[in-house]
């Protein structure tokens, strides 16, 4: 399955929540979902009550799009989470939060996860002093994530560093001047602001 390349604001309207796929625009009044909260192509709210399957599917799609993960990748993350100790849904979200592109975004080094993926792919990021250009790389407790020395004069990265205002989660620490951050520990569920009900995702895959 190819990565979605269409208008990302339509995805937010489809899921009925902000997925923060468009960077700064998502934090402004220009966000389309503020103006039109109905799904794209639909004129007026549907009166049909969604089935249990449809509700579970929507929740899975919402999480997948929130993190920009392909279908097969998402299935692998669920399989990984189901084999670990703990509550499967919470472990799934924790695993998604550990993705390098998500951590780069959470640290404020990118305006969106899509931009974070590009920054990682273009070899602007290092982990523990070593270049890592794989967005799906899973960070661990104690890892130091930083913008590479050779990339610090990159125009877009300098703009982001100068405008950084996003609140950094408690499980991360960031030195914005050094363009470096540390994974203090793995996140707890109440520290993950992903707007999904993970139990519905577990139910979807448990059918």
UniProtKB/Swiss-Prot annotation:
Membrane-spanning intervals of the chain: none
Keyword terms, alphabetized: Ribonucleoprotein, Ribosomal protein, RNA-binding, rRNA-binding
GO molecular function, one term: rRNA binding
Keyword Cell inner membrane recorded: no
Domain of life: Bacteria
Any one cellular-component term (Gene Ontology): small ribosomal subunit
UniProt-listed GO biological process terms: ribosomal small subunit biogenesis; translation
InterPro entries the record matches: Ribosomal_uS4, Ribosomal_uS4_bac-type, Ribosomal_uS4_CS, Ribosomal_uS4_N, S4_RNA-bd, S4_RNA-bd_sf
Signal peptide from the UniProt entry: none
Record-linked CDD domains: S4 (cd00165)
Keyword Ribosomal protein: yes
A Pfam entry, by short name: S4
S4 RNA-binding domain ranges (all copies): 98-161
Function recorded in the entry: One of the primary rRNA binding proteins, it binds directly to 16S rRNA where it nucleates assembly of the body of the 30S subunit.
Quaternary structure and interacting proteins, as annotated: Part of the 30S ribosomal subunit. Contacts protein S5. The interaction surface between S4 and S5 is involved in control of translational fidelity.
Family statement: Belongs to the universal ribosomal protein uS4 family.
Protein name: Small ribosomal subunit protein uS4A
């Amino acid at each position: 399955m190819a990565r979605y390349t269409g208008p990302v604001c339509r995805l937010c309207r489809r899921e009925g929540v902000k997925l923060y796929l468009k960077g700064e625009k998502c934090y402004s009044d220009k966000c389309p979902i503020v103006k039109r909260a109905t799904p794209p192509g639909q004129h007026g709210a549907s009166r049909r009550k969604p089935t249990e399957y449809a509700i579970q599917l929507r929740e899975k799609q919402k999480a997948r799009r929130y993190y920009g993960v392909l279908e097969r990748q998402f299935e692998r993350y669920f399989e990984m989470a189901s084999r670990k100790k703990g509550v499967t849904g919470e472990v799934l979200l924790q695993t998604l939060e550990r993705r390098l592109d998500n951590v780069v975004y959470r640290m404020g080094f990118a305006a969106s996860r899509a931009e974070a993926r590009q920054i990682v792919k273009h070899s602007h990021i290092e982990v523990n002093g070593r270049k890592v250009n794989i967005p799906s790389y899973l960070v661990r407790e104690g890892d130091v994530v930083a913008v590479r020395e050779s990339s610090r004069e990159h125009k877009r990265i300098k703009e982001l560093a100068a405008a950084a205002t996003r609140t950094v989660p408690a499980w991360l620490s960031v030195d914005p001047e050094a363009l470096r951050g540390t994974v203090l520990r793995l996140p707890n569920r109440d520290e993950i602001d992903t707007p999904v009900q993970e139990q519905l995702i577990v139910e979807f895959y448990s059918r």
